[in-house]
Each structure stands twice: as C-alpha cells, then as structure tokens.
C-alpha cells in the first residue's frame, strides 16, 4: 500500500484501521471476488459494480469503507436530497470524537443568500464553507476527498491532523482538499495593480504570494473554485 494512503487511512479510520488493512489484503488476493462479496459497500460509496470494466483500487476501498464506517459521507454535487442532510451527516461524524451534540449556527449564512442568484450546484460549496468556519473554531475541519467526480465525499478531522494532508494526492486519483472557496474577479489590472492585490488579500483572505503570482501572468483565467 502507498505510504501516503496508509498514513491518511490511519488518521481517517482510527479504530477501524486494522479492519481496513484486512480488507486490503483480501482485495489484493482476489479483486473480483472481493468486489462481488462487498457489493453493498461499494454501492453505498456510489460505485458501480455492474460493469466488469471497472477497475477498483485501494483508494476506492478506503473511501467506501470510510462511508460504511460513518467516517465519511457522500452527496451529489447538485444539492441535498432533503434539508439538513449535510448537517446530519457531519453531526454523526462528530460523535466519533465524543461530540454527542453540536449546535449549528448557520442562520446568518442562510439569511445572506440571494436565492435568485443561487444556481444548481452553488449551494453546497457555500454551505460547506460556512459550516467549516464554525467547526474550525472548535478545532475541526471538513475534508474533501476529491476524485474529480460529480459528488462530494467529505469527512471530519481535527484541524491539526488535516493540515498534514491538505492538497496531498493519493494514487494520482484522489486529492485531499478543504472546502475553502476563492471568488476572484479581475478584468483589467491597469495601473491599480497594488490596490487590486491589497483588495483581494483583504476581501478573500488569499495569501499575498498567490495573488502576486496570479496577477503576474499575461493571461488570466477567472472563475470560482476550490483552494487548489
């Protein structure tokens, strides 16, 4: 097993880690049989086991096992199936850290939304960011396991543990990222470049070194995305 995957799985799965290692051993002995025997686990992780063309990896095993162990959850990019779905799943994950009850305070965030401008797929990134800010105050962080698919796979880690893995790539397939969003709109640098850079730093909390690199390019692609 890749050393980075091993370290992250140990931090993510905690007391379930040894069981995960046993599953990996069985998977590597006979992958086809393993997938057939654990079809429900893969389905809960939103993996299609019906096609023989699908090749699963140790990273896939970790993601699916984390979900059935309530260490991770998955949701479609377009939005919640029911109101409060994300809060409920994160509240469940916090119980792994002995937090039986977490008082969410997202009313200010909800009231600030202009629903006439919120398009399909816009709400979840904003919700994750608002919830992450509240969790950060208690020493925890939302962690995205980004597989470049049309869903969010998210977990909760103590912030001190998460920072060790932020922006780490596993198996050239999964990237561990935060839900922080940068919204940068820059049409014309003109003669006001220092003021623009200062504004971006204060407005969006983007590191100045990143802003300088961004503004130094001859051609700039603008958009909304995650922190990497």
Regions found by a protein language model. Give the residues of each.
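Acidic, proline/glycine-rich low-complexity IDRs
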Residues: 1, 116-181
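N-terminal "domain-start" segment
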Residues: 1-102
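A short, ordered amphipathic alpha-helix with a cationic face
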Residues: 9-10, 153-154, 184-189
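Short glycine-rich, low-complexity/disordered patches
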Residues: 21-41, 102-118, 135-152, 179, ...
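Generic preference for hydrophobic/aromatic residues in regular secondary structure cores
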Residues: 47, 61-63, 67, 75, ...
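Surface-exposed, low-hydrophobicity interaction/linker segments
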Residues: 75-143
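Residues at alpha-helix termini
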Residues: 96, 137, 171, 202-203
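Short, amphipathic alpha-helical interaction segments embedded in low-complexity terminal/linker regions
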Residues: 178-228
């Amino acid at each position: 097993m890749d050393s980075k995957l091993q370290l992250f799985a140990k931090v993510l799965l905690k007391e379930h880690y040894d069981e995960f290692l046993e599953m990996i051993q069985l998977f590597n002995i006979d992958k086809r049989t393993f997938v057939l025997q654990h079809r429900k686990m893969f389905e809960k992780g939103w993996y299609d086991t019906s096609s023989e063309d699908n090749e699963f990896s140790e990273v896939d095993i970790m993601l699916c096992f984390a979900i059935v162990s309530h260490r991770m959850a998955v949701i479609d990019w377009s939005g919640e199936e029911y109101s409060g779905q994300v809060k409920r799943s994160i509240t469940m994950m916090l119980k792994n850290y002995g937090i039986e009850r977490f008082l969410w305070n997202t009313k200010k965030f909800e009231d600030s939304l202009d629903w006439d401008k919120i398009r399909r797929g816009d709400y979840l990134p904003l919700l994750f960011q608002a919830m992450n800010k509240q969790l950060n105050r208690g020493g925890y962080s939302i962690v995205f396991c980004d597989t470049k698919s049309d869903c969010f796979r998210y977990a909760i880690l103590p912030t001190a543990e998460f920072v060790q893995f932020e922006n780490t790539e596993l198996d050239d397939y999964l990237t561990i990222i935060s839900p922080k969003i940068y919204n940068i709109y820059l049409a014309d640098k003109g003669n006001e470049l220092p003021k623009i850079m200062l504004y971006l730093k204060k407005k969006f909390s983007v590191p100045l070194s990143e802003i300088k690199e961004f503004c130094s390019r001859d051609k700039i692609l603008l958009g909304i995305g995650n922190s990497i």
